[in-house]
UniProtKB/Swiss-Prot annotation:
This is Replication restart protein PriB. InterPro entries: NA-bd_OB-fold, Primosome_PriB/ssb, Prisomal_replication_PriB. The gene is priB. The lineage of its organism: Bacteria, Pseudomonadati, Pseudomonadota, Gammaproteobacteria, Alteromonadales. NCBIfam families: PriB_gamma. Homodimer. Interacts with PriA and DnaT. Component of the replication restart primosome. Primosome assembly occurs via a 'hand-off' mechanism. PriA binds to replication forks, subsequently PriB then DnaT bind; DnaT then displaces ssDNA to generate the helicase loading substrate.
Length: 101
């Protein structure tokens, strides 16, 4: 079996919550990550934005705390998602979320 596990920390820049027609609670946030990492013995600035999806009852207790400007760490798996306009992007499906502030 292939491995698919990602840990990413950052600041929430957008957040929305909704329930699917089947009644499942979902939160969709945009996570902005900034860090510095070494690559080929050179310090490199790293920046990315990634959409994070939190689904199910286990996240209902934290959903109200997921506001713009809050720092979090997310663990989960990545998957390809196609938007309504046909563009593909990677999204992070959360399995664990930890508030950092």
């Amino acid at each position: 079996m292939a491995t698919n596990h990602l840990v990413l920390s950052g600041t929430i820049t957008r957040s929305r919550s909704f329930h699917s027609p089947s009644g499942i609670a979902h939160s969709v946030i945009m996570l902005e990550h900034k860090s510095q990492c070494y690559e080929a013995e050179m310090l490199r600035n790293v920046y990315c934005q990634m959409q994070v999806i939190l689904s199910g009852e286990r996240f209902e207790s934290v959903t109200d705390k997921l506001k713009i400007g809050v720092d979090i760490e997310v663990q989960g798996f990545i998957a390809l998602q196609q938007s309504r306009n046909g563009q593909n992007r990677l999204v992070l499906h959360a399995e664990n979320v930890e508030l950092k502030t």
